[in-house]
Amino acid sequence: MAKLSCSYLLVFMLVFSAILMVEKVEGEECRLTIDKATPCHLSDCRLSCYTGYNGVGECFDDPNVPGPDNCGCRYNC
């Protein structure tokens, strides 16, 4: 019976520590429009976002910036 209780305690501790680690990893996500002067090329956008902000670059239409597509960067703040 003591072995069973110890096993339950160990499993509970592992699950609890995993939950705590997941909460730390989840952060606030920021979004920034980069390179507003030129049209978006996906490969260049992803490269500049990754090197500058360690994020994911994507092309989207920003209504505040003139032009068809702009490069946006999503990254952890």
UniProtKB/Swiss-Prot annotation:
GO terms for cellular component: extracellular region. Keywords: Antimicrobial, Disulfide bond, Fungicide, Plant defense, Secreted, Signal. One of its GO terms (biological process) is defense response to fungus. Residues 1-27 form the signal peptide. Its main location: secreted. It holds the Pfam family SLR1-BP. Disulfide bonds join C30-C77, C40-C59, C45-C71, C49-C73. It is found in: Secreted. Belongs to the DEFL family. This is Defensin-like protein 161.
